[in-house]
Amino acid sequence: MSTNLVDYVDDSYLNQSMNSENGLDSVTQIMYDMKKYNIVNDVLPPPNHEDLHVVIMAVSYLLLFLLGTCGNVAVLTTIYHVIRSSRATLDNTLIYVIVLSCVDFGVCLSLPITVIDQILGFWMFGKIPCKLHAVFENFGKILSALILTAMSFDRYAGVCHPQRKRLRSRNFAITILLVLAVYAFITLCPLLWSFTAREIILYAKETAPGMLTRMKIEKCTVDIDSQMFTAFTIYQFILCYCTPLVLIAFFYTKLLSKLREHTRTFKSSQIPFLHISLYTLAVACFYFLCWTPFWMATLFAVYLENSANSSSVPPVFVYIMYFIHALPFTNSAINWILYGALNGQLQQRYRSNRSNSTKKTTTTTASTALLEKKITNLNTNSNYQVNGSMNSIATAAPTKTIGNNEVLVATSTIDDDVATDVVDVRLLSNHNPTFL
């Protein structure tokens, strides 16, 4: 950041001094009087494409981008095909899956921008794209987690309260999704509003009399004070992580308990309790594994920022943060497998649709063959009747002129069936009647 008079330069990247007493890297700040310089040259640092850790993370992010975008588009296409073919209305489960796939698709769209930012080491797209990037990434990830909570409630209501049909109606699902979207937006509104492309001066040096050269970059980050950011992080941790996690655990625990009770009461029950239990456990654990490290690392980073030894962060922590930051993206990139590809209702509809399509094709083929057979029999009977009535005429007079240039001719006689044909005599060498 710069003013008209002075620039405070964070020289911690290129000119760090070691404090011998506590063994910590101290940040050097240099003050320049900008009135002394007529020329100020701003340069960019070299990119990070030669850093192996950055390259590995960039490749990982790109793989998540391909997996998430292709997978979510495949789920949406399958649902569209099933609904269009069967001409059925959307139920609550498919509505949840559609909205979840759309939100996760938006989250995955932010990954290429993140990769570019990692490789370059700075933000190059300006302030407005920075805010849009924050909306797609942060708002999408939080809303995705809230939708997973709503889906767990939907399954809980279907098993534990089947008599309350309103809880699983389409209108109720749409209302819940709208409420969650507003909730996520209000929760993240201060953060999204404070995101901006912030200027940071890494290094500055007087390269000639009256000339100052600065290494200046932009970073897409929040522009609020430390205490406000700490309070907001804790508040977001409680509302956007702890609350959904507790609700998901509660709903799935109640669901499994109800199914276990049902299988014990009805020994001949056909409910695949073990399969449902493993699937539910996989869904809950996947959510926990993707989001818990992210929030723990975020809280730890806030603690380090507010502690006295904040400059003692080892470089390896930065790469660990990059890896942990990829976990919520992993959640969005794989949700379509757990909630779309493995969705029993969607699979059943898809198989039923394919089966109906196959039956329609078989029925159409059989109907066509039967129609052709009837037409053949009809033609045969018609020929027989005509030939039978014309037999005496053909015997007495082998040919009969129909028009000026046409004659009716007879061929062979086999079992009283006389094949007849009309020949255009203009095609013959002479106009004499000819038996074919």
Swiss-Prot record:
Annotated glycosylation sites: 15, 309
CDD domains, per the entry: 7tm_classA_rhodopsin-like
GO molecular function term, any single one: G protein-coupled receptor activity
SUPFAM superfamilies: Family A G protein-coupled receptor-like (SSF81321)
Extracellular side: 1-53, 116-132, 193-230, 303-316
Major location (coarse): membrane
Cell inner membrane is among the record's keywords: no
Membrane topology (Cytoplasmic): 75-94, 154-171, 252-281, 338-436
Keywords assigned by UniProt, alphabetized: Cell membrane, G-protein coupled receptor, Glycoprotein, Membrane, Receptor, Transducer, Transmembrane, Transmembrane helix
Membrane topology label: Multi-pass membrane protein
Entries under InterPro entries matching the protein: GPCR_Rhodpsn, GPCR_Rhodpsn_7TM
A single cellular component GO annotation: plasma membrane
Annotated TM spans: 54-74, 95-115, 133-153, 172-192, 231-251, 282-302, 317-337
A matching Pfam family: 7tm_1
Keyword Metal-binding attached: no
Compartment annotation: Cell membrane
Function, as annotated: Putative receptor.
Family as reported in the entry's similarity comment: Belongs to the G-protein coupled receptor 1 family.
PANTHER family given in the database record: G-PROTEIN COUPLED RECEPTOR C06G4.5-RELATED, NEUROPEPTIDES RECEPTOR
Protein name in the entry: Probable G-protein coupled receptor C06G4.5
